[in-house]
From Swiss-Prot:
Organism expressing this protein natively: Staphylococcus saprophyticus subsp. saprophyticus (strain ATCC 15305 / DSM 20229 / NCIMB 8711 / NCTC 7292 / S-41)
Gene: gpmI
Pfam families: iPGM_N, Metalloenzyme
Protein function: Catalyzes the interconversion of 2-phosphoglycerate and 3-phosphoglycerate.
Keywords: Glycolysis, Isomerase, Manganese, Metal-binding
Family: Belongs to the BPG-independent phosphoglycerate mutase family.
Chain residues that bind Mn(2+) 2: D12, S62, D438, H439
Matches recorded under InterPro entries: Alkaline_phosphatase_core_sf, BPG-indep_PGM_N, Metalloenzyme, PGAM_B_sf, Pgm_bpd_ind
SUPFAM superfamilies: 2,3-Bisphosphoglycerate-independent phosphoglycerate mutase, substrate-binding domain, Alkaline phosphatase-like
Protein name: 2,3-bisphosphoglycerate-independent phosphoglycerate mutase
Membrane-spanning ranges: none
């Protein structure tokens, strides 16, 4: 007899917001979501700031969200850990950072600093760059080159000049540091093996020829003149800088989120790299703020804190069969991040990865691969052996990042169609679903004055539990979702999971 599965369905980037203006969630025609919302118990939970282990007021993101969801507790994020280490001075005593600096001193070479130059707090924070500059100054370094990746996604689309000016003021204050190259994150921080993009950023960083400007500011302004926003600024070299990354140098990459920093780091450190032809660099000391992936051969500044008893491990320990399913853009989130930074499958776990469409930007294909994800899930459900399903629909977030309202509405409408088929199938099997999100985004695609808003929001996310006869607590946080799943599965919650089920007892 087929099992009665319990599913967690994450509508990525889908949050509650009262105002309809620029709110794709409110404006979309979503009969299935609305039907479940009126029929079943609902609540809303917090998905940002202190509730997910981030600094107060900091918007949540997919990595942080899935980690909190899977862990069933508040997980203190890299950003919070690094800020704390700077505040209490441990940062300046860090062995890996000091080893990088000593390597430069020994070789009379250059320290290169890579990273996303913004205060978005999703992948990086530029104040961490300032702390690195303080450390380099304290240690007497003279040559520090900054290779800046521009954001325009987790912050305003054209905000780079503000960060560039503040960084140049820091260079001036300390008497060290200069911009060496600048690339939009579209090039330097790809995660889908689009090596043609990464190669352009790599060539600028190595100073292998290409567009040159006399200053970072001039280069950004020239890109603005071509109607390019920060994310899409074409990699360029800053004139003063004429050395690039060379033998005997050191690199510190200060992004703390792994998924968009791994590919560039592989190019510099993986001797087996085959994406395009690279010139090996001898005696390069390469350090990354966190572990990016197994192909990156680097020293780690902040080692991972191990999370035990995540939802996947508890399911395994109780002999349950689980499925993780998403398209490429969110597959690491339902696997690696939801398992607390673990790549290996648990016993009884299987995975379905559906390729994301190969388009330049997802507003060109708002449905992305939602229908294929839905079809694959129905196929898996028909096997009748699943206890637990962890599913992510990427569209509201990925299309929401375009800052375009109509495509984002279409994205949500496509997901709603898929949601209906999936939830109805689970219900028909006698199972239950929790429909929720990991953070906001599509709830505010336009600002009040109709400018594109490409960032996440700090709004609470909805929760629907498709089970009759229960009521839900009035509030909670993402870390309460795993305990709620275990509650539906009639599985005891381990002590490590300090979240609380949203179901009233």
């Amino acid at each position: 007899m087929a099992k009665q599965p319990t599913a967690l369905i994450i509508l990525d980037g889908f949050a509650n917001r009262e105002s309809e203006h620029g709110n794709a969630v409110k404006l979309a025609n979503k009969p299935n979501f609305d039907r479940y919302y009126s029929k079943y118990p609902t609540t809303q939970i917090e998905a940002s700031g202190l509730d997910v282990g981030l600094p107060e007021g900091q918007m949540g993101n997919s990595e942080v969200g899935h980690m909190n969801i899977g862990a069933g507790r508040v997980v203190y994020q890299s950003l919070t850990r690094i800020n704390k280490s700077i505040e209490d001075g441990d940062f300046f005593e860090n062995d890996v950072l000091n080893n990088a600096i000593n390597h430069v001193k020994k070789n009379d070479s250059v320290l290169h600093v890579f990273g996303l130059l913004s205060d978005g707090g999703v992948h990086s924070h530029y104040k961490h760059l300032f702390a690195l500059l303080d450390l380099a100054k304290k240690q007497g370094l003279e040559k520090v080159y900054v290779h800046a990746f521009l954001d325009g996604r987790d912050v305003d689309q054209k905000s780079a000049l503000k960060y560039i000016e503040e960084t140049e003021a820091k260079f001036k204050e300390l008497g060290i540091g200069q911009f060496a190259s600048v690339s939009g994150r579209y090039y330097a921080m790809d995660r889908d093996k689009r090596w043609d993009r990464e190669e352009k950023a790599y060539n600028a960083i190595r100073n292998f020829g290409g567009t040159t400007f006399e200053s970072a500011k001039a280069g950004v302004e020239a890109n603005y003149d071509k109607d390019l926003t920060d994310e899409f600024v074409e990699p360029f070299i800053v004139q003063d800088q004429n050395e690039g990354v060379n033998d005997g140098d050191a690199v510190i990459f200060y992004n703390f989120r792994p998924d968009r920093a791994g590919q560039l780091s592989e190019i510099f450190t993986d001797k087996a790299f085959e994406g395009f032809k690279v010139e090996q660099i001898n005696d390069l000391f390469y350090a990354t703020f966190t572990k990016y992936n197994d192909n990156v051969n680097a020293e780690i500044v902040f080692e991972k804190v191990d999370l035990t008893n995540t939802i996947g491990e508890v399911a395994q320990d109780n002999g349950l069969k689980q499925l993780r399913i998403a398209e490429t853009e969110k597959f690491p989130h339902v696997t690696y991040f939801m398992s607390g930074g673990r790549n290996e499958e648990f016993e009884g776990e299987r995975r379905r990865l559906i390729d994301s469409p190969k388009v330049a930007t997802y507003d060109l294909k708002p449905e992305m691969s939602a229908y294929e994800v839905k079809d694959a899930l129905i196929e898996e459900l028909n096997k009748g052996d699943l206890d637990l399903i962890l599913l992510n629909f990427a569209n509201p977030d990925m299309v929401g990042h375009s800052g375009m309202l109509e495509p984002t509405i279409k994205a949500i409408e496509a997901v709603d169609e898929c949601l209906g088929e999936v939830v109805d199938k689970i219900t028909e099997m006698g199972g239950h679903a929790i429909i929720t999100a990991d953070h906001g985004n599509s709830d505010m695609v336009l600002t009040d004055d109709d400018q594109p808003m490409t960032t996440h929001t700090t709004n609470p996310v909805p929760v629907i539990v498709t089970k009759d006869g229960v009521t839900l607590r009035e509030t909670g946080r993402l870390g309460d979702l795993a305990p709620t799943l275990l509650d539906l599965l009639n599985v005891d919650q381990p002590e490590d999971m300090t979240g609380e089920s949203l179901i009233n007892h």
